[in-house]
From Swiss-Prot:
The keyword Manganese does not apply. The keyword Transport applies. PANTHER family: METAL TRANSPORT SYSTEM ATP-BINDING PROTEIN TM_0124-RELATED, ZINC IMPORT ATP-BINDING PROTEIN ZNUC. Keywords: ATP-binding, Cell inner membrane, Cell membrane, Ion transport, Membrane, Nucleotide-binding, Translocase, Transport, Zinc, Zinc transport. The gene is znuC. One of its GO terms (biological process) is response to zinc ion. It holds the Pfam family ABC_tran. It catalyses: Zn(2+)(out) + ATP(in) + H2O(in) = Zn(2+)(in) + ADP(in) + phosphate(in) + H(+)(in). This is Zinc import ATP-binding protein ZnuC. ATP binds at residues 45-52. The complex is composed of two ATP-binding proteins (ZnuC), two transmembrane proteins (ZnuB) and a solute-binding protein (ZnuA). Part of the ABC transporter complex ZnuABC involved in zinc import. Responsible for energy coupling to the transport system. It is found in: Cell inner membrane. Belongs to the ABC transporter superfamily. Zinc importer (TC 3.A.1.15.5) family.
């Protein structure tokens, strides 16, 4: 769902042809995207595709080996990690979790806990929280310092379907109330947060980008998941003009094979996200029950 109102907003961070190399190997390269105030950008891709590395470049944790990263002066970042190491043998309340990296006024803690719907769990032990409650606690911790940019690494990991919908709705409300930019990382290649403005698919580089399509409004879907799910989730259709082979090489739509896949190797992205897909989707390009288009399987 494209929010055109964000187009003219202040850019918080931008990456231009950015990449990170470690021990002679590129973790990711040729990354280009920006996040503006009030905008939601979602990075998707398989494990090891460079999603977290790209996010770390954006917030300054990882230094680019090539390209450029620009950030708004004085940018405040709130970060929800994919994993948080906690010694579960030590007592740790939700309120104490909020101040692990520095003191916070009680009113700010209470406001953040209220905003994430867990004020009643302020004194609960973290180890006793459900997956969804723990993610809400991490979100509360991230927004308590009023960030300009909120970076969420797999925020719905370990949460069931109804919890995923509730968390995406919460993230939308946080964006709307705080007008912060959101950079969201997701392991799901095909279903994304419906409020996402831009989806960027990575696999060591930018494979494709576009906007999510609304989730199916079929009676079967509505009967199974209800209208709330349709508002929270959306399907993203990949438009790749190449295939990643098991040995790491890249096969292009014309049949040629190269050792790498850079922007000049044949990527082209139209405004609507269509970019000369090399996949065979069948006559109508329908989606299979697993969310992939008919005939599409990622290598």
């Amino acid at each position: 769902m494209l929010h055109s109102a964000h187009k003219g907003n202040e850019i918080l961070v931008s990456l231009a042809n950015a990449g990170v190399q470690r021990n002679g190997r590129w973790l990711v390269r040729g990354v280009e995207f920006s996040v503006s105030k009030g905008e939601i950008v979602t990075l998707i891709g398989p494990n090891g595709s460079g999603k977290s590395t790209s996010a770390k470049m954006a917030i300054g944790v990882a230094k680019p080996s090539e390209g450029k990263v620009s950030r708004k002066a004085g940018l405040r970042v709130g970060y929800v990690p994919q994993k948080l190491s906690v010694d579960w043998t030590m007592p740790l309340s939700v309120r104490r979790l909020m101040t692990l990296t520095g003191p916070l006024p009680a009113r700010e803690i209470d406001a953040a806990l209220n905003a994430t719907g867990i004020a009643h769990l302020a004194n609960a032990e973290v180890q006793h929280l459900s997956g969804g409650e723990f993610q809400r606690a991490l979100l509360a911790r991230a927004i308590a310092r009023k960030p300009d940019l909120l970076v969420l690494d797999e925020p719905v990991q370990g949460v069931d379907f109804s919890g995923e919908i509730a968390l995406y709705d919460l993230i939308k409300n946080i964006r709307n109330s705080n007008d912060c930019g959101i950079l969201l990382i997701s392991h799901d290649l095909h279903v994304v947060m419906a409020e996402t403005d831009t989806v960027i698919c990575l696999n060591g580089h930018v494979c494709c980008r576009g906007t999510p399509q609304a989730v199916s409004q079929s009676p079967e879907y509505m009967r199974l998941f209800g209208g709330t799910a349709a508002k929270a989730l959306a399907v993203y259709s990949h438009h790749h003009d190449h295939t990643h082979l098991p040995d790491g090489r890249v096969q292009h739509a014309d049949g040629t094979v190269t050792d790498h896949c850079h922007p000049e190797d044949g990527h082209h992205h139209d405004e609507d996200g269509e970019c000369g897909c090399g996949h065979d989707h069948g006559e109508h390009g329908d989606h299979a029950p697993d969310g992939l288009r008919q005939g599409e399987r990622h290598v």
